[in-house]
């Protein structure tokens, strides 16, 4: 599916431009044009990505973030129950993309699943956090080089805990770009 190759492409470009930082940058609030907002390190730039409603990239830190919206109405139109839990939705995504692992709650109560992929220039680890509002499921995926991932896991959980979703549909649905 398009997400796999897009994740690989975005992360490969990021990994090639990664530089080590001596200390963590300041936290700032990002308000995306979709209405989604989150707090994370300064230095991220908005990034358009086909098949996603948006994203961010920080080349200095080697981190990319992609945001996807899947409307409940679109799920219902293809016979999938939009009333499923976040855990069920996570398993649905993992099945769709052939990913192995488990859907879990992190130490801060965020629902997520984690997976690794080989990309040009190395291995990447993906932390996919799951949300829902009144009209859609949302997936916000934080990506980094696998060898940096353990050191970023807590940071990603903290950032994920700050996410606020838009109240209306954005309009871009996974697989319908």
Could you say what each language-model-derived stretch is?
Residues 1-7:
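Bacterial N-terminal signal peptides that target proteins for export
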Residues 43, 47, 92, 96, ...:
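Structured segments of extracytoplasmic/periplasmic soluble domains
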Residues 16-19:
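C-terminal motif of bacterial Sec signal peptides marking the signal peptidase cleavage site
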Residues 111-177:
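Short, well-structured beta-strand
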Residues 50-139:
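Conserved polar/disulfide-associated segments of primarily extracytoplasmic proteins
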Residues 23-50:
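N-terminal "mature-domain start" segment
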Residues 40, 85, 89, 152-159:
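Stable alpha-helical elements in mature extracytoplasmic
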